[in-house]
């Protein structure tokens, strides 16, 4: 057990306990091997009975792990190593296991998934993409089925397939489900748009293991999953706003802080806009849409870079995943930003649709009773994992020692120097036949390096968002002798790079990074492509003072150094800066960048807390209606509330001479078009009783017509009101966040401003739901068609 020695000294208390459990599991190895297949399979029923009789998962953990270990050997021919068992124990505890590339995370997960599925509440493994989910479910599913558990797959290899509720219900009722994080998120949102029990399929979220946990739970945490609905009225302001913004001068008409990624219109820009549009007051309420479009255009031009944040493919804007450079198919920026980028690129501006429902990964995964994660790089973000998800990160030792050499960065003053030095280094390594993975920070830079390699006569493959369809083939060939692969950071995660014949003797895979990424974890992922399962290899990064990392997060003295020395260097004779302070500088700058990323994610949580509270409230009320339970939007209760509120309004705000008009208008707008006048002499109590009488008569008539279907009618009326109000609220909250963020330039706390306005909007939404339900119940027309189906027409 020497592999644990160094780790024990760092994390003695945590791993000693795991070691004791591992010893117990190992002691059961012989016993499990003597069992017949039938006896081994019978253990599942035994475990479930023991749980019913009061034992806990921890009580049966060692024995259950030993059972799965033996099943893995019999079914797959693979017996999990001790380090994989340790990883499985960490996952069972609801923590994140940091396991290096090639250490067998897929097999590791079989043990905690089996154990946690025994409770009958469901266990999920969520991967990065559909291919991995389907592959792992097929391969590992053999083990679970051998042990008597059912396995479901939440995704399909046919992207066009639209699964119905019954199919999804069968998937999610399985003991173990393999899916992707995005598929789960969208299924959750769709499930909460259901209008009847038959359309619902999602169980309570119990236990999940998230693969590439740091990428999903941290890096993608700020990206909401959004279901879009009906389009907004198409705006013609995008083009006008774009034209004006192009005439603006940076730091004169608008302020741009690249380090903080903030941009806003200054007073001079406001005056220019007022002159351009011939309006006296730019920020007047009537100019709200104009102000919004100008800010959107400004963001599109300054905060989103082609080749880095998005690509243009066949006339469409396609977003890039910041964590891996891959295209986010089917994903669009919300709130009009996407349309502003389309205008910036002179493309057809697509309709801006309203958000019907949305949720962030943070809030989705915080709904699980127990959450675990697997990743190759999580330890450096342990503090954030603990604060956000209450998950520790445990570094699992490798089964074989890591033999990769990570060389210190080669640091240059200017970008041209760095590029020249990188190409020369690639030539030297390529001459030895050693395979090379050259990683650039953006699509644009990857294409530049590709052109320079072509000019140097070095054949290579180019892997970026534009060529992702060939990814599997390129990665499979990247470890072959003489191979050179130029890629964006999408090469950092995914399929393992296996060394070809004779490559180990040449020194293994050479990973050459052309800049430090915004997060140390991304660099560690890239380094980890070399040295898989004890393979030999090395990594070398080339950096400069002109890299995005240094421009956005570097200290002032570094910027001063660059300005002072940039004209003193010869790009064709690059000179590396060897002083220790420069090595320290890039390390500290990356740490600062990591800190900014953490702060931004923390702010996302703060912003999203309002949305989450409202979402929980709306979904709870919807489910109460669907399940026939009493809730705040019980139709009977709403009749009383709306009429009582109207009477209170008459009593406090309406003059006596306007009373009849107000009552008649209320009846006509909300209750009935067959208006019956009221007497001037009627008291408020008599008016109240009169309104209740009208409501009772209308509902009695509908009840007589609908019979047993009347309950369905009431529920549908309330659900329609909730959904319409919630769609408006989700859309409004997205717009509000954009406005609130801009307000921090006025020395206001954007989160406080957002919560204040969101709370107002929340109360308005609840009032609107009650009033619209009232209208739906009374003003709607109901009938049965010739097939006997209920038809409801809401006004």
UniProtKB/Swiss-Prot annotation:
GO terms for biological process: intracellular protein transmembrane transport; protein import; protein targeting; protein transport by the Sec complex. Its EC number is 7.4.2.8. The keyword ATP-binding applies. GO terms for cellular component: cell envelope Sec protein transport complex; cytosol; plasma membrane. Pfam families: P-loop_SecA, SecA_DEAD, SecA_PP_bind, SecA_SW. SMART domains: SecA_DEAD, SecA_PP_bind. This is Protein translocase subunit SecA 2.
